[in-house]
């Protein structure tokens, strides 16, 4: 009797990451509908929402311990829809529907996204890769490719028609993005980038500017992100080549991080883990009140 509330709650938490992935697919597909109805701003917003959900579902799964092979496959399929099919159809419906050449470019992009995702999944199971490769993507990741393609529509919404809306420029840009997706150029994983403590204040200030730009100039912000990402590629190539020549440097960095975490734990030996998601701590008074434990009885 006492175990039913806990088991029901555990099941609900286990399906949360997959639910977020399904919601991201719905957002990506709905962006196509708004593009066909000539509402490009709503289409861009929905693709952005799909990207946010895609970035959160994996982290939520790790926090809840709900990682599974099925979840990985759903996430990969969601990336193909949200960052491959949806941006291509949105761009075609809003800017390239008047020319057959545009359709060729639009076909090329999602095909390259699928090939890139297939290679990513294959590399996950490859245990022969050096340890330092964990810090890099092989080729442009699918979300970055989607931002690059949608950035073309953002230019039109910000500045109107111009050479940046011409068919030749659109096709060249989409083709270039597609080639970056399937290339073997190393690109840094953003979650591996750490901010030094003495730059913490600068980082917080930049976050404030970013938040203001989301509201005041979202389309210009998209291009700031695109250009910043493209500019980081030469540094990522140099960093990857240096690590390939000095793999012991990555091992030393990992060891230093491990030692720092261990030193922090030793500095606070009596520190208690912070309970997450409101889960009740065994032996707490709240469990006695809720009927999950009898007073005076310990869990074994």
Swiss-Prot record:
Gene3D superfamilies documented for this protein: 1.20.120.1760
Lineage, broadest ranks: Bacteria, Bacillati, Actinomycetota, Actinomycetes, Mycobacteriales
- Kindly list the GO CC terms recorded for this protein: plasma membrane
Q: Which gene encodes it?
A: pssA
Provide the GO biological process annotations: phospholipid biosynthetic process
Q: Where does the record place it?
A: Cell membrane
Domain of life according to the entry: Bacteria
The family classification in the record reads: Belongs to the CDP-alcohol phosphatidyltransferase class-I family.
Residue stretches spanning the membrane: 10-30, 74-94, 95-115, 135-155, 162-182, 207-227
Which membrane topology term applies here? Multi-pass membrane protein
Q: Can you name this protein?
A: CDP-diacylglycerol--serine O-phosphatidyltransferase
Which GO-annotated molecular functions does the record name?
Answer: CDP-diacylglycerol-serine O-phosphatidyltransferase activity
Please name the InterPro entries in this protein's record: CDP-alcohol_PTase-I, CDP-diaglyc--ser_O-PTrfase, CDP-OH_P_trans, CDP-OH_PTrfase_TM_dom, CDP_ALCOHOL_P_TRANSF_CS
Ordered alphabetically, the record's keywords are: Cell membrane, Lipid biosynthesis, Lipid metabolism, Membrane, Phospholipid biosynthesis, Phospholipid metabolism, Transferase, Transmembrane, Transmembrane helix
Reactions catalysed according to its record:
a CDP-1,2-diacyl-sn-glycerol + L-serine = a 1,2-diacyl-sn-glycero-3-phospho-L-serine + CMP + H(+)
Its Enzyme Commission number? 2.7.8.8
């Amino acid at each position: 009797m006492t175990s039913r509330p806990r088991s029901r709650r555990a099941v609900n938490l286990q399906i949360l990451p997959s639910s977020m992935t399904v919601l991201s697919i719905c957002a990506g597909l709905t962006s196509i509908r708004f593009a066909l109805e000539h509402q490009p701003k709503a289409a861009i917003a929905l693709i952005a929402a799909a990207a946010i959900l895609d970035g959160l579902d994996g982290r939520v799964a790790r926090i809840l311990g709900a990682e599974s092979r099925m979840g990985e496959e759903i996430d990969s399929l969601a990336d193909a829809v949200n960052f491959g099919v949806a941006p291509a159809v949105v761009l075609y419906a809003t800017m390239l529907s008047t020319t057959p050449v545009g359709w060729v470019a639009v076909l090329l992009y999602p095909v390259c996204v699928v090939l890139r995702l297939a290679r990513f999944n294959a590399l996950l199971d490859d245990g022969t890769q050096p340890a330092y490769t964990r810090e890099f993507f092989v080729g442009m990741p699918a979300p970055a490719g989607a931002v690059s393609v949608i950035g073309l529509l953002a230019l039109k919404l910000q500045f109107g028609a111009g050479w940046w809306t011409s068919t030749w420029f659109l096709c060249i840009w989409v083709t270039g993005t597609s080639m970056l997706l399937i290339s073997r150029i190393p690109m840094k994983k953003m979650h591996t980038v750490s901010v030094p403590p003495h730059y913490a204040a600068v980082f917080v200030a930049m976050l404030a500017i970013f938040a203001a730009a989301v509201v005041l100039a979202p389309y210009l912000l998209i291009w700031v992100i695109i250009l910043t990402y493209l500019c980081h590629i030469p540094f990522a190539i140099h960093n990857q080549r240096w690590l390939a020549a000095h793999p012991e440097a990555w091992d030393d960095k990992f060891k230093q991080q491990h030692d720092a975490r261990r030193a922090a734990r030793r500095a606070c030996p009596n520190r208690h883990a912070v309970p997450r998601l409101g889960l009740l701590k065994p032996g707490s008074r709240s469990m006695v009140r809720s009927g999950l434990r009898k007073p005076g009885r310990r869990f074994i």
